[in-house]
Amino acid sequence: MMNAEQVQAAVNQVMPFGKYAGRRLFHLPEPYLVWFKQQGFPAGKLGEQLALMYEIKLNGLEQVVAPLLHND
């Protein structure tokens, strides 16, 4: 179970590589997260954050976590 700080960190984490490098995980398209789910999320913290974003989008919870986005 993740706490609020971990959810906020995941929402604001910047994708470090790939086609969507530089985008916040919150803004990754759902098909990209589905692809990661099928191929396997990377190991470590980033993989956990991507898996969380997959679950958020899968369950339609974007509006719930959107207020956690930083405006920088």
Regions found by a protein language model. Name each.
Residues 1-72:
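DEDD superfamily 3′-5′ metal-dependent exonuclease/proofreading module
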